[in-house]
Amino acid sequence: MEPKVSVGILWNKKITFILNEAYLYEGQETSGENTVSFNDGKIVWNGSAYDELYFEPQYKDASFTIKDVVIGINFHWERKEDQEFQGALKLIVENETITAINIIGVEDYLTSVISSEMSATASLELLKAHAVISRSWLLAQIEKNREIIAQEEKYTTFIETEDERIRWYDREDHVNFDVCADDHCQRYQGITRANSNIEIVKQAIEQTRGQVLKSENKICDARFSKCCGGIVEEFQNCWEDTKFPYLVKLRDDDSTQDIPDLTQEQESIKWIHTRPSAFCNTQDKKILSQVLNNYDQETTDFYRWQVVYTQTELSELAYRRSGIDFGTIQELIPIERGTSGRLSKLKIVGSKKTMTIGKELEIRRTLSESHLYSSAFTVDKKDDKFILTGAGWGHGVGLCQIGAAVMGEKGYQYNQILLHYYIDATIEKLY
């Protein structure tokens, strides 16, 4: 039987939504524009206070619109837009604010994710591959959440001492729903964007209905990112120290060349400062447009890129982004790298404080107004400037979306694409 998923859409003191067709609240029919506000630990709606509200669609195709949903949170493309959703709407109180949650069947959720994460102009094989990994990742997260709750132990994603801050970003925020709608989980925008070439997306979902990746009899935590930069990263270098047999280093091409050991600094420098052949090393706009939505295409350099800061800019930025007063930053010293060359530990040497930070997303957040494209970068100092030369976009674990798009164009079938990125996994039908 197809499961349902609860998706966190928006957090705000005040939320305006429109029930576009008839919805039921405690058996009473309601529709039209509504506004709820947070007051004294309750949700205020139509003059009354509630702990939570649940609106059930009266008809299968009924939809609701939430105004001013923030997309691309903390990324360079952050913006607000009105978004339309099918399924049920649940409103709860969480952290002194109101959270809007969409409850919907997994396959309908996937239809939106595929057209939100990828352009719907992608090849059918790429869309099918993405359907399987998105379904696998989602069901693995739901299972992981149950395990965390059952353990009763606090799920730790933060380790800080006097001279070290190690943090990873994964499940820590989501207690009252399964996943969020932003890039923190999987980009989900309801049926807002699910209208463009929707038939091929539905075809990809239907042809892979219920299919997931499995390894050692468990659903795979099938991670993916925009561009690995030529070599895929391993899970434990980005999140908790758990090694998965299907999320291991591999070269993103069809050659049998040796994989350089990018945990070694000199090998990383050599790799990042060249453009080795890889599926994801492409400038083909037709292929890129399959993966990158319009707001993603504001970025064009991702296989190899460069960012330059003055010493003053870097010092002020790191203080503002991390809250740590390093003083004037004198050195950025790579301490530990993963298999793709991504830094998992970086020492920041300042006139007031020296501290090692990690993992990859903490490094990316500290050294950018939003996020550096990746933590696979080298550091060169020239006069008062710090030059960061980097590779790839995202954490680099699992499927490389641009690499997979190139494979689809080259004629690879979806199962071949999946088994290239997820080593020794199997594809199985759950329902």
Q: Where are these predicted regions, by residue range?
A:
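Conserved, single-site charged/polar hotspot
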Residues: 1-431
